[in-house]
Amino acid sequence: MKKIISLILALAMVCGAMFALASCASNEGCKIGVQQGTTGELYLKGDADMAFAGYSNIECKSYSTAGLAVKAMLDGQINYVIIDNEVAKALVNQNPGTKVIDIALSAEEYAFGVDKSQDNIKAALNELLAEMKADGSLDALFAKYDALEYDDDGNVIGGDENIVGIDSADKDNNNAAGQLVVATNAAFAPFEYKKGNQFAGIDMEIMKALADKLGLELVIEDMDFDAVVTSVGKNNIDIAASGLTIKESRKQAVNFSDSYFSEAFQVLIVPTSNTEFDSCKTKADIEAILKAK
């Protein structure tokens, strides 16, 4: 599958400034920046579901976008950044004075979270995803969003002129059987975002295709990310679609579909002047250095 360069710019677009801090050798200790709610944050803080031990010796600084984390590094507020590999590549391209340590620290897969009582929806969705993988339309969908342009906060500001927005019908609890109600957090382009009063993104297009396949009216409910998974099965919400990483704890609330994106992994961004990771060959090499901070 073609990797998502668009996601990347969604989280980047930062003005670069040369960075003077080369390592964590300061009285304040080591600080690493992450995007809030991402696997990178879980990796640093620790997460039993994903078998992450975390780093009690490192201060995790969370930012609303990866671009802001890199800006903080360039400004000397933090030492490194941990973020998705494709995001990292674009951030480094946008910001002179930075480089990627291209060794995977973690891996994740994205899937949709379906109401446990609706196996028919899960079956139809898995069938749809299999068809899209087989005929190349899933790859084409990812490629379609490569041209997105973003501001510093990750908001789409261009590149989607040829993308048709998706309307959400009004929710009708008296017609639950005739509607597919999707929970999302429409602030994660290219997977989901608002285009005026409409929705757009990879996840949203897959949900529209699923609704059409099932002969249902599509309803999209935009909410805080933390509520997306837990909302499923309540108030007639059928499915969660929000760039969801498959996690054991989430399986308590939903049944996951087959994965539709499995190329994400976390890497380290450091200042160009930093050489302490240059000889690293494996994840263990990097982790040994981080644990010694």
PLM features: what roles do these ranges have?
Residues 1-31, 36, 44, 84, ...:
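Gram-positive cell-envelope targeting signals
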Residues 27-64, 85-86, 186-189, 199-212, ...:
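Bilobed "Venus flytrap"/periplasmic-binding protein-like clamshell domains
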Residues 34-37, 95-106, 116, 208, ...:
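Acidic, polar ligand-binding/catalytic clefts
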Residues 38, 111-152, 204-213, 270-287:
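Extended ligand-binding regions for polar small-molecule ligands
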Residues 89-129, 148-167, 186, 261-270:
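Periplasmic-binding protein-like
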